[in-house]
Swiss-Prot record:
Name listed for the protein in its UniProt record: Putative pre-16S rRNA nuclease
CDD domains per UniProt: YqgF
A GO biological-process term: rRNA 5'-end processing
HAMAP family named in the record: Nuclease_YqgF
Entry similarity comment: Belongs to the YqgF nuclease family.
Keywords for the protein's UniProt record, in alphabetical order: Cytoplasm, Hydrolase, Nuclease, Ribosome biogenesis
InterPro entries: RNaseH-like_sf, YqgF, YqgF/RNaseH-like_dom, YqgF/RNaseH-like_dom_sf
Length: 143
């Protein structure tokens, strides 16, 4: 059952954004990049989304939704909601939120287990977290 269009997932931070993408059948996730930008310069992240939309046919944008460990809304949650509104104003694309609790911790543990140095981890942690966010989303679509 092919879906054909891909899903792009983001782990949005204050000055970095991890990107990951699905295959066309929505079964496999791949880390794309860790994009660095000036603090709160979300326009540059919007432009980077445009770049990936030109590279791949994308039908859904999944944003990591940073709830607190207790499942409550936080200032970072509001930031991601604001960013989602910016995306919707710029593109006709379905935007969905995916709980991202502990994804960075999970990515960090994985990289530590591989013996990756701190410096190298900092260069890939967000794109790996985006991949985990996307995997979680894809798992909700299996049935």
């Amino acid at each position: 059952m092919g879906k054909y269009n891909r899903i792009l997932a983001l782990d949005l931070g204050i000055k970095t954004c991890g990107f990951a993408i699905s295959d066309q059948n929505w079964k496999i996730s791949y880390p794309l990049e860790q994009f660095n930008f000036n603090r709160y310069d979300f326009a540059s992240v919007i432009s980077r989304i445009a770049f990936w939309m030109k590279e791949y046919p994308i039908s859904i944008l999944v944003l990591g939704y940073p709830l607190t460990l207790a499942g409550k809304i936080s200032p970072r949650t509001k930031m991601v909601e604001y960013f989602a509104d910016l995306v919707k104003k710029n593109y006709e694309i379905k935007v969905v939120f995916q709980d991202e609790r502990l994804t960075t911790k999970q990515a960090q543990t994985f990289l530590l287990d591989l013996g990756i140095s701190f410096k190298k981890r900092q260069k890939v942690i967000d794109k790996l977290a985006a991949q985990i966010i996307l995997e979680r989303f894809l798992n909700t679509k299996k049935g």
